[in-house]
Amino acid sequence: MNREIYDFVAIGIGPFNLSLASLSAPLRGVRTLFLDKKSGFDWHPGMLIETSTLQNPFLADLVSLADPRSEYSYLNYCKLTNRIYSYYMRENHYLSRAEYTRYCQWVAARLPNLRFGCDVQGVLHDPESHSYLVTGQHTMSGQRFMFRCRKLVLGLGSQPYLPACCDRRAAPFIHSADYLRHKYELQGRASITIVGSGQSAAEVFHDLLRESGRHDYSLAWITRSPRFFQMENTKLTLELISPDYTEYFHDLPEARRQEILTQQNSLYKGINASLINQIYDLLDEKVHDGDNRYTLLTNSELRACRYDPLQERFQLDFQHLDCDRPFSHATDGLVLATGYSHEIPACINPIHDRIAWNADGSYRIGRNYAIDHEGSEIFVQNTGLLSHGVTNPDLGFCCYRNSQILRELTGTEHYRIETRTALQEFSPPADGVLKHRPARRAERRPTVAARPLMDIHRATL
């Protein structure tokens, strides 16, 4: 047993906990440990499609919105890997998924507080020492381990969600999370169907559409959504993923929060507008060239999925929601781009009674992201959609959340936590009267002689 007592141990190393590790590593006197059963950092490897990009700009890296001077920033990664000038010349603020993964792997290799290949199998509470024991097994050697800590952070991520009618044991369908691993096998089928409407579904459809000229498959994209809608990214709308809105959202009654989330799908479930346009343009070219192998259909809910192993075909039953009419669909290959869901990890079963639970069995998450009854010992990442809203899965918000979590874990605000970030109001005035803001008194400004305009961005000295 390791006799060192850590200030906190974090379980799971995805982007959110990797951000927390990056922000906590420089803090003197703060002893931390991050554990993951994988052999190294690997973020959605099945969706590292060549043309796929993040929907956040590069500033939403692991650290910059909390500490722009951090050695773990994306720009420092570019500088130290001799890529900063090529990135500057590209003038593209959106990273590919593959580039973001390379950046995260670069950071992970430099952090001293990460331990991969550690399968956490149990978490116990020791009331005498007021500490937690994190136990498990090294995946390579099989050797047992035990670490003691005062606090915990759970960042185990989400699991592929499957519709209730789809039984993985009975049918060899593919979830989009595993798409690349099965792509070439899939392209050997006579027909392929994608079910789902979000970014992942669009990326898979676009990838198969681009390469369909080299193959003979027919391609269908079917979704329950009423349309193939784009993700909203206008500036005032984006303030709904600001710290100010998160505070406002958390204070609303739970029933109202549930209603609001159903209205905000386009904030976090939509498709990048440029990708929608690329799909349309490519479809238009193919149709005008006489290639009509493609079907897109909305308002269609999957009700049943059967697989015939002799014919190696899927038989799908749908219900068209607008017309209230059923229809069937046969296909040789099936990709379910049906999103992800959170599962309670079995390793925390021994401390179940120390955690606050909602009636539906989910965590009751406090404003500070704590889930224990005291609100000060056990914290979670990326499981608070109902409690904190659409900022929960957003990469750009992780620095703000981690700055808050670090303050709760250590008792010190190591990184400034902004309290006023939005240009708009979300709550009505407390006194019931909305007043105009006072006009700013005009200041006399010095007169400067006019100078010729020039493009200083491209100026050469």
Curated annotation (Swiss-Prot):
Presence of the UniProt keyword Amino-acid biosynthesis in the record: no
Keyword terms: FAD, Flavoprotein, NADP, Oxidoreductase
Cross-referenced InterPro entries: FAD/NAD-bd_sf, Lys/Orn_oxygenase
Cited SUPFAM superfamilies: FAD/NAD(P)-binding domain
Organism: Bordetella pertussis (strain Tohama I / ATCC BAA-589 / NCTC 13251)
Descriptive protein name: Alcaligin biosynthesis enzyme
Positions annotated to bind FAD: V9, A10, I11, G12, I13, G14, P15
One Pfam match: Lys_Orn_oxgnase
